[in-house]
Structure formats: C-alpha cells, structure tokens
Amino acid sequence: MQWLQLILALSILVVIHELGHFCFARIFKVRVEKFYMFFNPKFSLVRAKKINGKWQIKFFASNVEPSMVPLLDAMGNEKKDEKGQPLYRPMTDEEIQALPQEDWRRYPDSTEWGIGWVPFGGYCAIAGMVDETKDATNLPSEPQPWEFRSKNVWQRLCIIIGGIL
C-alpha cells in the first residue's frame, strides 16, 4: 500500500513539474508535441488529442511515429552523420497533409496528452528542443517560429526552469 502512495505522490510532483515547462512553452508560443505522465515505450494506456475542436481518445494504443522522415542523398540513400546515425528532417506541410485524416501527426498544433504504462516520471516533448541525443549542427532546417530553438535565450531559460517554479 505504501508503494502506491509513493507512486501517487511522485506522479503528482512530476505532473506539476512538467506543467511548469508546458505553461512557459505555451506562453512563448512554442509547440508542445506531447505531455505524458509515466513513460510509454511501444504503447500508451491512454492517449488524447483535441482535433478540430473535438477530443479524440485512444486506449491501449501504440505510439505515433514522430513527424520526421529520413534525410536522403541524391541516390535515395539515407544520409548518416559521422557516427553512422541516420539524419532526419521534419515533414513538409505537403507530406503532413498527405497523411490519412485519422493520423494525429496531421494536426501538429495541438498537444497529445497521455498516460504511459511505466510508472517512472513523465515528459513534455517540446518542438525544436535539442537534447543530448541530438546534435544541433546536423539539423537540416532553419528553426521555425514555433520551435524552442528559435526563441531568445531568456525565453528558453524560462521554459527550462519553468519546471521548478
């Protein structure tokens, strides 16, 4: 019983922490792609997204692939960085509009909310945030106005420290 109380208490703290990042990102008009309580490898217990004014909810649904496609060379082969990792680029507006109507990636302006199934932590996926798994020099496109990396230093700082406020 005490482990349930611990998980509940930590979950509340994580949600409040991630809401801090979320709120500051939205204040500065940065897209937040996902907001999750708990981690969700492979699938999520609950996923929800507001599309055209209506909430769509899915239970026990597999995760949506990121809106990224491999960067190709002139021969049609995947480009790789110096470490041999594939390079990706964001989907173009035309590629996004070509997705089926039911594909949530077609609606990048709204946040996907969810509950994962691994009860450790949570996350807030902010558009254009370059983390330790990415190299900013390998990003092929110019920063978009709604991306984290396009914001002033003080705005990025507010978004980062928003989790502790």
Task: Identify the residue ranges that each predicted region occupies.
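Pore domain of cation channels
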Residues: 156-165
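Alpha-helical membrane and juxtamembrane elements of multi-pass inner-membrane transport
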Residues: 1, 151-155
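Short, membrane-interfacial amphipathic segments enriched in basic
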Residues: 142-151
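Small-residue-rich helix-interface/hinge motifs
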Residues: 2-139
